[in-house]
Structures are given as C-alpha cells and as structure tokens.
Amino acid sequence: KIEEGYYTKNGMEKGNWSFWDRDGKKRLGKKIDYKTFKNIGLYKHLDGVFLVTGPIDGLSTAYTQAHGAVRGGRLDGPWTYWDSDGLLSAKKYYDKGTPRGQYTTYHPYGHKLADGVVNGIDDYGNLIKDGKWLFWDENGILKEEVHFNSGKREGLTISIVIAKGCSEIV
C-alpha cells in the first residue's frame, strides 16, 4: 500500500490521507499543490517532509519520487531522488533552497556516477563545484578525479583510461 484517503464526488482528493514510506512506515499528511519545484506536479505533505511525484529537475531528468524537507517554501536539508523504476538516482543537500553540500548522482545499476561538494548555483544555473570530485563511467569504473575551486577546475585532474584490459593514469 502506498496511499489511502477519500475523494469528493467530483473526484478531488479530500482531507487527510495516509501514506506509507519505502520502509512501510505509515505517515499522515495532506495532498497539496506546491510550486517549489521547476515543473508543476502533485506533492504530498508528510509530517513536514514532502514526497514528490513527477518530473522535478528540468525536462531532461525525470525523477518520479523525491523525499526531503521543505522549510519556508524552499528545499532544505538532505533530499533523496528515485527514478521511474524506484532505483536511487541522486542524493543532494540544500540550504534554504540552494544546493549546498554533498551532491551524489547514481547510475540505474546502483553505482555512483558523480560525487562531490557544491556551494550553490552560478548566474548561468550551473552548480558551483568545490574540492575533489569523482566521476565514474556507466560500468562503475572510476574515470576521473577533478579538483574545483568556486566552480572552476583548479590544480590536478586525474583521468583514468582503460583500453584492452589495462589502465593508465593520464
């Protein structure tokens, strides 16, 4: 069971609903429309935490479920995203609506694709990466270590090239 509640004669959801999280824990909440995200969708309020269904991160990335807190109308604290198959796709941290902190994306097979720290978004909407970032290929093999300072590559970049069974650090 995922959710349970009542509908009006017009088919509109009414009153408090019960929801079950991924661990089977029952939560109470109320379905509401919420416009914190870039695309409009239906959001379910659960004890101060929101479960989100539908695309929420632009047109090219569709998350079908997200879980995290919204405070003061903005994303805040840790958020976890799952893809349309229910597989983990990202873990992100927000500070009053701004991405800030650990930022990890995952391949549908479960291994990491990118992992590092962000300190906000620049004027063009790009993440401001800081410190060491690691990038893996679709097979889960580490392919690059890049160091950033305020969103710009800085210092050592290590690329790992794998060809015909041998690897080389460039």
Where are the model-predicted features located?
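Glycine/tyrosine- and acidic-biased, solvent-exposed loop/turn segments at the edges of beta-strands
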Residues: 1-170
